[in-house]
Amino acid sequence: MYKIMLCCSAGMSPSLLVRKMVDAAKERDLPVQIDAYGVAEFDMQFPQYQVVLLGPQVKYMLKMLSEKAAPLNIPVQPIDTMDYGMQRGDNVLNYALSLIAAAH
């Protein structure tokens, strides 16, 4: 199962994107767990996931969050702003899967 965490300022804004990513995974019969959290929950949640994607609101925290996740070999990367804004769940899912593949 692929475990993907989305992180934004409060954990609420990516909920539609999570749904679209799950739908895209179902179309391909991919087993996924995709959850969204606020950045305040990052430290407690990220070890459970294979990749963390950051929403545009918290992209400025990339360096700090990446450094926290690096010892566990968990990639942390920002979501493409256009894909986020247009809610392109399939593109974001593809990006997450490529990061997981590159890290493992």
Predicted regions and their residues:
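Short acidic active-site motifs
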Residues: 38-42, 61
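Conserved active-site segments centered on acidic
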Residues: 2-39
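Short glycine-rich anion-binding loops that position phosphate/pyrophosphate groups of nucleotides
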Residues: 10, 57-59
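A short, gly/pro- and small-residue-rich
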Residues: 61-81
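Short acidic/histidine-rich motifs immediately flanking catalytic phosphotransfer sites
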Residues: 46-52
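Short, well-ordered alpha-helices that flank and scaffold nucleotide-derived cofactor binding pockets
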Residues: 19, 23, 67, 94, ...
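Short, surface-exposed alpha-helical segments at coil->helix boundaries
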Residues: 15-19, 59-66
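Ser/Thr/Gly-rich flexible loops in soluble cytosolic domains mediating phosphotransfer, phosphorylation
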Residues: 3, 75-104
